[in-house]
């Protein structure tokens, strides 16, 4: 399978390139970056001291030439541009970008009628196992427990709460028969009054180089249960993304998530 990487000079882009180069059965066929990037024209493996023969380019058609799948962990506005090109060229996509609005999510769903897409809030196997644990816990602790989602990320992250935190909230809300759009509480300040027992609260921390910490607290009277996942490296995300690309090999169309890739549905 031939794989192209978007955001090739970024932290996640470099991790993805390294993962592709170190995975049997896949080949790096293209590397994309934004116009004006100082990395344009460089070999995609330069940061590793390896010559891949793939030059980083801002030309979407050139970067996607020969690709079976594009892996994109960039920003919503960039991903949507890449999505349009991939759809036109028949290139499948693995999308790890977070922060999409409803229109962006609808565009992904529409494109999935033409190409195979894996779109997930988090590509870590551990995080996706945590989603299943939260589903079970929410059903067991459906009454008498207040639910709070606390997440922490590095200072450079531009969206909040994280896509993973929101997915955790959605999993819990679905398990309880609630709608996160109406029960989610994303800010508290001043005299807020007593806590709504049906609400799901979110707290966001940004600082330093934290890769990603997520804790869901089920707080009852006299006891508290916490389910946590802490990432020490982006390696698990890169591994899951390449695994997702391979999953799409026999999927000409359709919108999938990491639960599909792992067979957890």
Swiss-Prot record:
EC number: 1.17.1.8
Positions annotated to bind NAD(+): 7-12, 33, 96-98, 120-123
Catalytic EC class: oxidoreductase
Pfam family, one: DapB_C
GO molecular function, one term: 4-hydroxy-tetrahydrodipicolinate reductase
Record pathway: Amino-acid biosynthesis; L-lysine biosynthesis via DAP pathway; (S)-tetrahydrodipicolinate from L-aspartate: step 4/4
PROSITE patterns cross-referenced by the UniProt entry: DAPB (PS01298)
Subcellular compartments: Cytoplasm
Family annotation (InterPro entries): DapB_C, DapB_N, DapB_N_CS, DHDPR_bac, NAD(P)-bd_dom_sf
Binding positions for (S)-2,3,4,5-tetrahydrodipicolinate per the UniProt entry: 154, 163-164
Matches recorded under SUPFAM superfamilies: Glyceraldehyde-3-phosphate dehydrogenase-like, C-terminal domain, NAD(P)-binding Rossmann-fold domains
Catalytic activity, as annotated: (S)-2,3,4,5-tetrahydrodipicolinate + NAD(+) + H2O = (2S,4S)-4-hydroxy-2,3,4,5-tetrahydrodipicolinate + NADH + H(+); (S)-2,3,4,5-tetrahydrodipicolinate + NADP(+) + H2O = (2S,4S)-4-hydroxy-2,3,4,5-tetrahydrodipicolinate + NADPH + H(+)
Record bears the keyword Transcription regulation: no
GO cellular component terms given for this protein: cytosol
Coiled-coil ranges (or none): none
Top-rank taxon, per record: Bacteria
Keywords of this entry: Amino-acid biosynthesis, Cytoplasm, Diaminopimelate biosynthesis, Lysine biosynthesis, NAD, NADP, Oxidoreductase
One GO term (biological process): diaminopimelate biosynthetic process
Active site as annotated: 153 (proton donor/acceptor), 157 (proton donor)
Entry keyword annotation includes Cytoplasm: yes
NCBIfam families: dapB
Function, as annotated: Catalyzes the conversion of 4-hydroxy-tetrahydrodipicolinate (HTPA) to tetrahydrodipicolinate.
Family to which this protein belongs: Belongs to the DapB family.
Protein name: 4-hydroxy-tetrahydrodipicolinate reductase
Gene that produces this protein: dapB
């Amino acid at each position: 399978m031939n794989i192209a990487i978007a955001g090739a000079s970024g932290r996640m882009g470099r991790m993805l390139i390294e993962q592709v180069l170190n995975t049997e059965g896949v080949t790096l066929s293209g590397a994309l970056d934004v116009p004006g990037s100082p990395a344009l024209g460089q070999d995609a493996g330069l940061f590793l001291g390896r010559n891949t023969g793939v030059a980083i380019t801002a030309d979407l058609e050139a970067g996607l030439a020969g690709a079976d799948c594009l892996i994109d962990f960039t920003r919503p506005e960039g991903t949507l541009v890449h999505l349009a090109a991939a759809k036109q060229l028949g290139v499948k996509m693995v999308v790890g970008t977070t922060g999409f609005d409803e229109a962006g999510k609808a565009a992904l769903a529409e494109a999935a009628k033409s190409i195979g897409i894996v779109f997930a809030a988090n590509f870590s196997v551990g995080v996706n196992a945590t989603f299943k644990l939260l589903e079970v816990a929410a059903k067991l602790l459906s009454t008498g427990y207040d639910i709070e989602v606390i997440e922490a990320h590095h200072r450079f992250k531009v969206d909040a709460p994280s896509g993973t935190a929101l997915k955790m909230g959605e999993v819990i809300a679905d398990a309880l028969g609630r709608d996160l759009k109406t029960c989610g509480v994303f800010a508290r300040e001043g005299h807020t009054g007593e806590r709504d027992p049906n609400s799901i609260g979110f707290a966001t921390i940004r600082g330093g180089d934290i890769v990603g910490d997520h804790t869901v607290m089920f707080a009852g009277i006299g006891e508290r249960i916490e389910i946590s996942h802490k990432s020490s490296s982006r390696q698990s995300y890169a591994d899951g993304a390449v695994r997702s690309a391979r999953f799409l090999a026999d999927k000409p169309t359709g919108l999938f998530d990491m639960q599909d890739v792992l067979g957890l549905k």
